[in-house]
Amino acid sequence: MKTLLLALAVVVLVCLGSANQLGLGRQQIDRRQRQAIGPPYGLCFQCDRKTSPDCSTAKKCPWYHTTCYTLYKPDDACGEEWAVKGCAKTCPTAGPYERVKCCYKPECNND
């Protein structure tokens, strides 16, 4: 029983170590240069007005998705309102009667 627990502990430690090497753990910071080490990621608000109208928490984006965007669509009052907020590698293209606003700083699509 003790050997089984010891083997399980070793497997957990090895898996956690490999997760950190893959960048799945905490973001590492180079203290001297004050920069993040490893693949860049964005921190954007990600939601759809139809499924979650309250978009109050920013989420970590996938690797290299550093562009935050807000997609606006026409509303009933002849104006426009946001329809989708998210992150992408590059700024998405707006469709007909749509407008996309892109930004490149963490949590910048909170409007």
Curated annotation (Swiss-Prot):
Keywords attached to this entry: Acetylcholine receptor inhibiting toxin, Disulfide bond, Neurotoxin, Postsynaptic neurotoxin, Pyrrolidone carboxylic acid, Secreted, Signal, Toxin
Pyrrolidone carboxylic acid carried by residues: 35
InterPro entries: Snake_3FTx, Snake_toxin-like_sf, Snake_toxin_con_site, Toxin_cobra-type
Residues annotated as signal peptide: 1-19
Domain of life: Eukaryota
Family annotation (SUPFAM superfamilies): Snake toxin-like (SSF57302)
Compartments where located: Secreted
Family: Belongs to the three-finger toxin family. Ancestral subfamily. Boigatoxin sub-subfamily.
The protein's name in its UniProt record: Sulditoxin subunit A
Protein species of origin: Spilotes sulphureus
Organism lineage string: Eukaryota, Metazoa, Chordata, Craniata, Vertebrata
